[in-house]
Structures are given as structure tokens and as C-alpha cells.
Amino acid sequence: MERKNASDFPQELLNLFDLYVHGDIDRRAFLDGAKKFATGGLTAAAIFESLRPNYAWAEQIPKDDGRVKTERATVDSPSGNGKISGYLARPAQGSKWPGVLVVHENRGLNPYIEDVARRLAVENFIAFAPDGLTSVGGYPGDDEKGGELFRKVDREKMTQDFVAAAQWLKARSDCTGKIGVVGFCFGGGIANTLAVRMGSDLSAAVPFYGGQPAAADVAKIKAPLLIHYAGLDQRVNAGWPAYEAALKANHVSYEAFVYEGVNHGFHNDTTPRYDETAAKLAWKRTIEFFNKNLG
């Protein structure tokens, strides 16, 4: 499949796809809305396929990269769904590292998120990417089916699963005991939520274009935050002014960056919404932030 960029699509069409991805409209409604852009022999179905992720593009760090060791792990989650499984990536050299929990989007633990875990491992972190779909069989290998399963999982229990995964990572003998979290889309919201739920047990949180916690809960945040937003992401950005006001009122340490002219999901290098310049800058800032706060 030819790789396309956001600039290859009208912004109205990208906004329509964003509504579909987040469950505000179904596939049929997207296809109906996309018909107006289907010209020159291009069909709405072809447009849909061109916007979907292509995981052949996700492997910045190959699975067999000699710098990284990976395995599957399952964590007990008595307050959640009982257990949560995930993907553990750690440096091949050394014996103890700071930990980073990697939280997926609203489709489950797909190859992009596994690659993010490996990217952290080559930066000398032990990274664990849990699969919030564990209780319904795990990520099914397809994002559309993953989205359907995602809607079936109790959200509070899933959140407790991520808390359990974070505490498990923190307690591992090969972790220094200092952990952070990075999350994308839904996972960005979970990164904010873990900052609230875990208090001083969390040492750093990096939400990428994630939903914000209630203002009343912000006082519970003890970890410093590095917050990334996409300039064209009106849906998520609408909650930022109130969140920032609460962070300031409660003297929470934070840095926030808005990457102008890019879309929600700009870090995900498997879709046309990926923006290489913004993604690389945000990731550089993320690694520097984790080195500062977890080292």
C-alpha cells in the first residue's frame, strides 16, 4: 500500500475519520460522509482503507533487535478483571532499569504500541505495555475488531488493570522502583488518570493527546507531567484550558506542548495522520523527561 500523509486528505475527511475512530460514528456513517470525496474513480471504501493503520510501517525497532529482550507477561489484577497480560521489553545489557508503562489507544495492544515499548528499551528503560483487552481475549490482530472489543470492557475495571500493571512493574526486581507512564489517545487519558490514582508512586506521566481528569482530582497528582497535544485536535484540546487552570491552582509541575498543524494521533507512524517532525520532537522531549525524572 502506498504511504499517504495527512496533506493528501482534506481536513474535513480527517476529522470525519477521527469521529469514526473514537466511536462517535460507525463505519457506515463514515463511508456515507466520505462519498463526497470519492472522485476520479476513487471509492469511499478505498478512502477508508487508505486511512487505516498499516502495521508493516510500525517497526522502528525490529522484534529481533539485539539491543532488546522481550517477553509476554501476565499480571494479577484483583480489583480489575482478574488478570492483564502484556508485552515486556527491556535492554539486553544491564540488570536494573527505571520502568515505563506504555498504554495503548482504544484498539488494544497493537504492533505500534509494542514497537514503542522496544523504543523505550533501547533508551535504557524496562517497558511494559499491557493489553486492556485481555479480559475479552486480547488484541484480535485487527483494529476494527479491537475497537469493538474495547467497547465491551468495563472502563473502571480496565483502569484498575492498568494500575495493577504499573504497580507490578514498579515492584519488579529488575526495576529501580521509579516508574513513569506514557499513553496515546485513550492511553493518554489513562496516563492522566494514573497520575491521579497513583500519587507519589508514579514519578512521571506523559499523555499524548489524552483526555483530562476532573479538575477536582488534579490535587492528587504528585508526578510531573509532560503533555503533548495536536494543534488540529479540537475534541481533546477543548478540555485543556480547564485542566491547565487546575494544574496551576494545585501547583502541579507540568510542561505542555501544542504541535501546530498536526492531527490527533500524530505519533502513530502506521497511519496518514502521522507527522514525522512533530512525532520525533515529542519523542525526544519524552525521553529527556523520563531521563530527568526517572534516572
Where do the protein language model's features map onto the residues?
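N-terminal secretory signal peptides
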Residues: 1-29
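N-terminal export signals
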Residues: 18, 27-53
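N-terminal cap/lid segment of alpha/beta-hydrolase-fold proteins
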Residues: 57-94
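Short beta-strand element of the alpha/beta-hydrolase
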Residues: 96-105
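Cap/lid segment of the alpha/beta-hydrolase catalytic domain
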Residues: 107, 133-156, 265-270
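Gly/Ser-rich "nucleophile elbow"/oxyanion-hole loop immediately N-terminal to the catalytic nucleophile
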Residues: 143-182, 293-294
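Primarily recognizes the serine-hydrolase "nucleophile elbow" in alpha/beta-hydrolase
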Residues: 163-222
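Short beta-strand/loop motif that positions the catalytic acidic residue
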Residues: 227-229
